[in-house]
Design a protein with these regions (language model features):
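Nucleic-acid-processing active sites and adjacent nucleic-acid-binding tracks
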Residues: 25-57, 62
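Short, solvent-exposed helix-loop connector elements
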Residues: 54, 126-140, 171, 256-264, ...
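Phosphate-backbone recognition surface of nucleic-acid-processing proteins
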Residues: 212, 218, 224-303
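Acidic, metal-coordinating catalytic cores used for nucleic-acid/nucleotide bond scission
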Residues: 61-74
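Low-complexity, acidic/Ser/Thr- and charged residue-rich accessory regions of DNA metabolism proteins
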Residues: 255-256, 293-348
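Intrinsically disordered, low-complexity and often Lys/Arg-enriched segments
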Residues: 1-2, 25-33, 336-348
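Gly/Thr-rich phosphate-binding beta-strand-loop-beta motif of the actin/hexokinase/Hsp70
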Residues: 2-22, 115
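Long, charge-rich intrinsically disordered scaffolds of nucleic-acid metabolism proteins
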Residues: 77, 87-209
Length: 348
């Protein structure tokens, strides 16, 4: 026996579980299956069931589950606190793996079996829970974004209604009231986000350092920190760039050379929140960002492509300042940029 693996298909009410093992010949065998409730009572039953089937304690065991909304979080945290090795898989990654197995049918028990096999065959990255501070900050920033999107929806409806053939004044009034309420809630959330940041003096100090960049406000930075868990899981800026979907992917085959572009296979909330700051830092002529924009735009003449490059650089500088607890200094950043460019010029 090489490894034990438990696959969990988690929904709002129940958890379908499959306990499998893989031997020296890479053959995966289902040992046991069970269904428990997605609540503390079910978690305890799950832990007992896993312990019962984990007969050879010296053999590694991993628990594999999908990131299904928020339904997996309580179970994952419970198992993590029990010192279990937990891997949380993105739904699209799990889906492609199950398709590769040639499974034509789909139900909860089949998904649990597939996840168990995935955990047995692959060396998956282990999951760590987000700290309470950044988890609550993420709840604030995501709610802010949700309300912003709702305001946009209702404003579009209001605009359409006011330009229709017959205007229903009652509905116009109702929409205006909803927009007013949401706008009030946005202001309340802004204050709550600021208060939450201030509750941690170390984070607030770093926030003030970074917000010296013209165009980067507390809300933008709070969103980046919330989505990255305060950069705690990143060992390099390259990892962060990939996480945010700013990494460049090639499109080449044989003699054919296609266009390169960013992958966008990452956290879209980070890219969304850095959209406006990228415009602002260029407009305010912040040297490191303006230089990058000018240089890239002169190469290809595409404004948005240059602004994406600015977004990426902005994220990397935020990461560096936060990790090193340094205030933003445009002169210093400009010197660092020249030092990085010079070796490449000498090499060429």
């Amino acid at each position: 026996m090489l490894k034990y693996s438990v696959g969990l298909d988690i929904s709002s009410k129940k958890i379908d579980c499959c306990f499998s093992s893989i031997d020296m010949g890479q053959k995966v065998k289902v040992q046991s299956t069970v269904t428990v409730s997605n609540n503390p009572t079910g978690f305890n039953l799950l832990a007992d069931w896993i312990d019962k089937n984990h007969r050879q304690k010296d053999i590694a065991l991993v628990i594999c589950m999908e990131a299904t909304g928020v339904y997996y979080e309580s179970c994952a945290l419970f198992l993590f606190e029990k010192a279990c090795k937990v891997s949380v898989i993105l739904p699209n990654k799990a889906k492609k793996y199950l398709q590769a197995l040639g499974l034509k049918s789909k139900n909860d028990s089949i998904d649990a079996k597939g996840l168990a096999q995935m955990g047995a065959e692959q060396n998956l990255k282990l999951w760590e829970p987000m700290g309470k501070y950044f988890y609550e900050l993420r709840q604030f920033t995501r709610q802010y974004q949700n309300i912003q999107e709702q305001i946009t929806v209702y404003r579009n409806q209001l605009h359409s209604l006011k330009n229709s053939m017959y205007i229903n004044k009652a509905i116009v009034k109702q929409l205006e009231q909803v927009i007013k309420l949401f706008t009030k809630q946005l202001k309340e959330l802004e204050e709550q986000i600021k208060n939450h940041l201030e509750s941690n003096p170390e984070v607030m100090q770093k926030t003030e350092n970074i917000c010296k960049i013209k165009g980067v406000g507390i809300l933008s930075l709070a969103t980046v920190l919330a989505e990255t868990n305060g950069f705690s899981l990143f060992e390099s800026s390259r990892q962060l760039v990939s996480f945010a979907g700013y990494d460049v992917v090639e499109n080449q085959s044989g003699k054919r050379v296609g266009k390169t572009k960013i992958s966008k296979k990452g956290n879209s909330r980070i890219r969304r929140i850095l959209f406006m700051p990228a415009f602002t830092v260029v407009r305010c002529k912040e040297a490191p960002f303006l230089n990058l924009y000018t240089r890239t735009f002169s190469n290809h003449g595409i404004k948005m492509k240059s602004y994406v490059a600015v977004q990426k650089k902005l994220l990397v500088i935020i990461y560096s300042l936060y990790k090193n607890n340094q205030p933003y200094d445009p002169k210093r950043q400009n010197i660092q940029e020249k030092e990085q460019v010079l070796p490449s010029l000498l090499a060429s």
